[in-house]
């Protein structure tokens, strides 16, 4: 039995320079796993709570000493001498101890840091990669796939201090035959875009997720420049590269007027009009994936958008579903969206994350494993994408080590799988 000997948590810094939590779980066998937890900027209102200290005299209130203390005391005492292999039971025990609907007592950040570290400790003890152990506890042993990346190359919205309304402009290298080639394609296009921005007199500073963050005239100008970067990199639109956008529509939505405002373009749209605004973009540019194309509370808007675009475009629910199986089940019933973004810290445990992924896959919803805008060097999401056979991953741009660390981990996983000659699929297509 792999008994828990010690749990040790601490404050570290995330990619924005604010505190987050890192936790080690030590087993009596001498093995230990550790993980750190990311933080979002544009967060869904239904997400599990990220516990902050709110002490304005320290880190502007963003400290996580309370979360660290809960892990080092109450959570450790509850898990001490327990079998770390009982992932589901221990995750459920932490949820029960927390005693709230949204993990607001301990904080989802505290609980998740322990949940991931438990699994990593057992993977090390078993001498298997983390993705293999994820596959094992997900009851899909050795059913691996290397995910198609969504590579963020222009940041806007809450992820950058610029005037672009839509939050993320991404490319997907659908013509790649491996993650190594996908990364090469992404890197070449990213750097070519930087050259084009300089030629046009725009800034090449980057945003939270490593994409360029210039002030542009419109959302369409961003798409136009990315198209040019693809062509000048000697790749073909639709054949080698398609586009993906994250609207983060809840940040554009006025709940009083129930209209979406694009400040940079000085335009407003109701729910139906905004769907047709996006539809127009998909006809002009090779956009094959739209995330959060409506406000998180606008289920009817999502239903209409799915009816209009859902047969040809990947419509991703992020704030809509917040990695919560309950909201996903409702969306499936209402035929809202056709894909789900998975963020570990939106729900707060590995067990609940795996349950949501399985529910999505059973109902033929595409799954995209995702980072957050405030990241760490932790590469858990790369293993999660491979181990659950998710098919896609969204982990930022081709710069900033908090983003490239995930791509580098995927390269190593692919190399390992090739060396072991294991049977696995490279899901480098948008739809299964």
Swiss-Prot record:
It catalyses: (2R)-2-phosphoglycerate = phosphoenolpyruvate + H2O. Its main location: cytoplasm. (2R)-2-phosphoglycerate binds at residues 167, 343, 372-373, 394. Its cofactor is Mg(2+). One of its GO terms (molecular function) is phosphopyruvate hydratase activity. It is found in: Cytoplasm; Secreted; Cell surface. Mg(2+) binds at residues 246, 291, 318. Its EC number is 4.2.1.11. Pathway: Carbohydrate degradation; glycolysis; pyruvate from D-glyceraldehyde 3-phosphate: step 4/5. The active site is at residues 209, 343. HAMAP family: Enolase. This is Enolase. It comes from Buchnera aphidicola subsp. Cinara cedri (strain Cc).
